[in-house]
Amino acid sequence: MVTVKKAKWGTEKVKQAIFCACLLVLPLLQFCIFYIGVNFNSILLIFQRFVGNNKFSFLTESGTAVGLSNLKTAFYDLFHTRNWSVGFKNSLLLFFLGLVTHTPLNLIVSYFIYKKARIGGVLKVVLYAPSIMSAMVTIVIYKFFVDEGLPVLLNKWFGTSYGAFTDGSTAFITIFLYGFWSGFGSSILLYTNAMGAISDSIVEAAKLDGVSFFGEFIHVTFPMIFPTFKMIMITNVVGIFGNQFTLFEFYGLTAAPPDIITVGYYLFQQTNLMGSDYYPVLSAYGLIMTIVSVPLALLARRGLNKIDPMES
């Protein structure tokens, strides 16, 4: 008679728990170091006030706790300061403009480069140029052409001229066009690398089934690189309110037209222009932006998971 020894109760569960813990150690350590560690002092500043000589206190002059007063000030400013409403509007507008224009073109250009199409070489040179050269060099060239060269051409051809960066009505679209051009490099690099990892056997099988050039992109390439696409989209959502969209590079701290500022630029501007006594309120702004961004990122992740071609 053969007897089978029973495993000790809970052994498998313990092994599973240890395995899960090992998987979570690195991301949790990264979160603790690069978020909690880096922002620990900023979080503490929310509950303090400036007392002079770069010193802060948790107590008011009357001896009571500062508490949530900085958060209250931050919330009041968010709903009663025009710069905040303009910043939110522009940040969201730039994000959605990039989503409906830049994202599809990123994918298509990456696909042309991946398939080694004739136009792919030209696109690679033109769109990689801003990533290869210094950002300040490309900005100076772009600004000189748009603000100095283009008005001369328009005056010669149509008898009219304008300064794209000084005119508030055209500055926004001019900044967007620069971001549109300069933003291809990193995304194309990620997409082409992901496409290059697709197995040749999968591509050959699709060709044997008679798939067309663009049919291969829709039915094979895009579903296979969807994890990369999802990662880029979630990263973009997280950075909506932190991105200053090169406004500082074009205008510095004070010269940007009020109608084109973004949340990221306004926060950067206030951090550099306001005194140390304003740091607690700025820290409160940062916490609020985090509280807003995290649910947006989770919603984006959930929505992208639902439309994942590999899951359906």
What are these regions (language model features)?
Residues K8, E12-S312:
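A structural signal for multi-pass alpha-helical bundles of membrane permease subunits
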